[in-house]
Curated annotation (Swiss-Prot):
InterPro entries referenced in this protein's UniProt entry, alphabetically: AIB/MYC-like, bHLH-TF_ACT-like_plant, bHLH_dom, HLH_DNA-bd_sf, MYC/MYB_N
The protein's name in its UniProt record: Transcription factor MYC2
Gene: MYC2
Similarity comment text for this entry: Belongs to the bHLH protein family.
Spans traversing the lipid bilayer: none
Tissue localization of expression: Highly expressed in spikelets and floral organs.
Functional description taken from the UniProt entry: Transcriptional activator involved in jasmonate (JA) signaling pathway during spikelet development. Binds to the G2 region G-box (5'-CACGTG-3') of the MADS1 promoter and thus directly regulates the expression of MADS1. Its function in MADS1 activation is abolished by TIFY3/JAZ1 which directly target MYC2 during spikelet development.
GO biological process, any: regulation of DNA-templated transcription
GO annotation, cellular component aspect: nucleus
Region of interest called Basic motif, as start-end residue ranges on this chain: 520-533
Organism: Oryza sativa subsp. japonica (Rice)
CDD domains: bHLH_AtAIB_like (cd11449)
């Protein structure tokens, strides 16, 4: 694919010389920093820094090419992932239309070994494409190197697809919200595409897929968008974005491998512009929902404030603890030194401090005072006014004698304010009044803890401030506003540190029964009712588990099924007790019958009365079947007596055997108990009675 055709012959010249792309500072590294202004022109210099920079060439003052190149190289070389290139798209302004767009800031290309080892096509079209790419690369090298480069210097190596995509990117720009970088800047959210480049709704992503790229990342920063590309599929992890931000900001681990720049502290304003600091929202017109403003006359046109930042959110920046402004007696420091002081103070405070310190500040004179923004109680920025007690600032400042915030030139926001002029006696009286107000408000805060909770939304910690030693007198009410602010701050601190919360008095225990579960105090009726219902539900769950047949799942049906089951169990218990009593009565009658029977005669009689001696009976029972073995003398037909006894005992015979050995007869019978069931002892006793006593057997 040839994205750099010969039809547009002026693209190269427009790319290198156009003022519409100010984000391409090839010589920004060699440009010396501007000399510091003289001290007596401090007001004019500060006004120039407040106004927005010209749209034609903001890049020369906003970037240092060497530092930006180091940032991009640290990402490529220091990441665990394999990135092919890194491009920083800088935010700029189109001079013709005035719209914001993203243009080429700088880039770093590493390449891919697999791309170089890939076999190239030997077709004439591929060869012509390579010649075209080499010619464009030679022109770029000659333009960058200047007059010292040889005109006939040739590019020996082939220009790979990814390298060509990187070169073509130099001529591209993206309006806000269009293209992958423009969408990332507009949404203020990182974009990570790892598997869907071919189907992404962006021409640049589809072109990247055509040239062999598989992963693209666009990360919005303060003044532009950082784009990364790779020929590998790299998925996003939880720490990918923070690591890339740390490498781009030249963290301690990444910056230790680079030699320090000789003028890094003075000639590198990208420390303030490129560092991805916490976002701020600084606007010219402050909404009434955030800060209540008394209605003063509008400020002069030359005092209009301009704040520039890449992203917007609420006030989350923390300015330096002591904010100073040079006075006529104090010469203004050079901008380079002021910038170093501001960077050191920001490094000490840390980038994520969310406090806003407005306790002590000074201002210089020489012009009319801008309006003083006095916050009301209960709003977003609470400066310590107690809304619970209905008090207001006892000394409101008039519009003509008010003070506001000032910072050193070159910081993120600045404002011209008059000098606070106060005589020595006025300062002494104001200090006494300040201490008295702090004491009275501290005692009032202890009586109103709700006010302290309302005022604790933002912490305005007090910090030491270097005040000018000389100057003209200022109205006492302006100093009174400062003292009132400090007093309210000390009031919050004293209420938190000095006055501990009183111990909660123990309520007397009520007389009555001791609370359950070892509780010290009885519960209220709501808690007791809740526990009673939980206990009742647990009982119903246990009852449902033991009832076998549950018709419905509601509590009424469960109770009815439980009652029916209990009645059924009670009926079974009654029937079993009746059967037990019947069996016990039968056993008693059998015992009485056996005891009442007359003893057998000792002597033998005739054939029917002769006793069969030496009778051995053995019965074994297995379930409803019994095996009977009888051994006796063969006289008096013992086999007939055995069959008669079995008939009387209602035993069914399904196997019988009789054998005679001399005078002994051995009988083995297998019977089945059909109607009555005997135990082994009962069967032995019944057979012995009927076989051993012939008289009983004959009956």
């Amino acid at each position: 694919m040839n994205l750099w055709t010969d039809d547009n012959a002026s693209m190269m010249e427009a790319f290198m010389a156009s003022a519409d792309l100010p984000a391409f500072p090839w010589g920004a590294a060699s440009t010396p920093p501007p000399p510091p202004p003289p001290p007596h022109h401090h007001h004019q210099q500060q006004q120039q820094q407040v106004l927005p920079p010209p749209a034609a060439a903001p890049a020369a003052a906003a970037f240092n090419q060497d530092t930006l190149q180091q940032r991009l190289q640290s990402i490529i070389e220091g990441s665990r992932e394999t990135w092919t290139y890194a491009i920083f798209w800088q935010s700029s302004i189109d001079v013709s239309t005035g719209a914001s767009l993203l243009g080429w800031g700088d880039g770093y290309y590493k390449g891919c070994d697999d791309d170089k080892r890939k076999q190239r096509s030997s077709t004439p079209a591929a060869a012509a494409e390579q010649e075209h790419r080499k010619r464009v690369l030679r022109e770029l090298n000659s333009l960058i190197a200047g007059a010292g480069a040889a005109p006939d210097e040739a590019v020996e190596e082939e220009v790979t697809d990814t390298e060509w995509f990187f070169l073509v990117s130099m001529t591209q720009s993206f309006p806000n919200g269009l293209g992958l970088p423009g969408q990332a800047l507009f949404a203020a959210q990182p974009t990570w595409i790892a598997t869907g480049l071919s189907s992404a709704p962006c021409d640049r992503a589809r072109q990247a897929y055509t040239f062999g790229l598989r992963t693209m990342v666009c990360l919005p920063l303060a003044t532009g968008v950082l784009e990364l590309g790779s020929t590998d599929v790299i998925f996003q992890t939880g720490d990918s974005i923070p690591r890339i931000r740390a490498l781009f900001n030249l963290s301690a681990a990444a910056a230790s491998s680079w030699p320090p720049h000789p003028d890094a502290a003075s000639a590198d304003p990208s420390v303030l512009w490129l560092a991805d600091a916490p976002p701020m929202d600084m606007k010219d017109s402050i909404s009434a929902a955030d800060i209540s403003v008394s209605k003063p006359p509008p400020p002069p046109p030359h005092q209009i404030q301009h704040f520039e930042n890449g992203s917007t959110s609420t006030l989350t920046e923390n300015p330096s603890p002591s904010v100073h402004a040079p006075t006529p007696s104090q010469p203004a420091a050079p901008p380079q030194r002021q910038q170093q002081q501001q960077q050191s103070s920001q490094a000490q405070q840390g980038p994520f401090r969310r406090e806003l310190n407005f306790s002590d500040f000074a201002s210089n004179g020489g012009a009319a005072a801008p309006p003083f923004f006095k916050p009301e109680t209960g709003e977003i920025l609470n400066f310590g006014n107690d809304s619970s007690s209905g008090r207001r600032n006892p000394s409101p400042a008039p519009p003509a004698a008010t003070a506001s915030l000032t910072t050193a030139p070159g910081s993120l926001f600045s404002q011209h304010t008059p000098t606070l002029t106060a005589a020595a006696n006025d300062a002494k009286s104001n200090n006494q009044k300040r201490s008295m107000e702090a004491t009275s408000r501290a005692s009032n805060t202890n009586n109103h803890p709700a006010a302290t909770a309302n005022e604790g939304m933002l912490s305005f910690s007090s910090a030491p401030t270097t005040r000018p030693s000389t100057g003209t007198g200022a109205p006492a009410k302006s100093e009174s506003d400062h003292s009132d602010l400090e007093a309210s701050v000390r009031e919050v601190e004293s209420s938190r540190v000095v006055a501990p919360p009183p111990e909660a008095e123990k309520r007397p225990r009520k007389r009555g029964r001791k609370p359950a579960n070892g509780r010290e105090e009885p519960l209220n009726h709501v808690e007791a009712e809740r526990q009673r219902r939980e206990k009742l539900n647990q009982r119903f769950y246990a009852l449902r588990a033991v009832v076998p047949n549950v018709s419905k799942m509601d509590k009424a049906s469960l109770l009815g099924d439980a009652i029916s089951y209990i009645n059924e169990l009670r009926g079974k218990l009654t029937a079993l007790e009746t059967d037990k009593e019947t069996l016990q009565s039968q056993m008693e009658s059998l015992k009485k019958e056996r005891d009442a029977r007359p003893p057998a005669p000792s002597g033998g009689g005739g054939d029917g009365g002769a006793r069969c001696h030496a009778v051995e009976i053995e019965a074994k029972i297995l379930g409803l079947e019994a095996m009977i073995r009888v051994q006796c003398h063969k006289r008096n037909h013992p086999a007939a007596r055995l069959m008669t006894a079995l008939r009387e005992l209602d035993l069914d015979v399904y196997h019988a055997s009789v054998s005679v050995v001399k005078d002994l007869m051995i009988q083995q019978v297998a019977v089945k108990m059909a109607s009555r069931v005997y135990s082994q002892d009962q069967l032995n006793a019944a057979l012995y009675t009927r076989i051993a006593e012939p008289g009983t057997a004959a009956r």
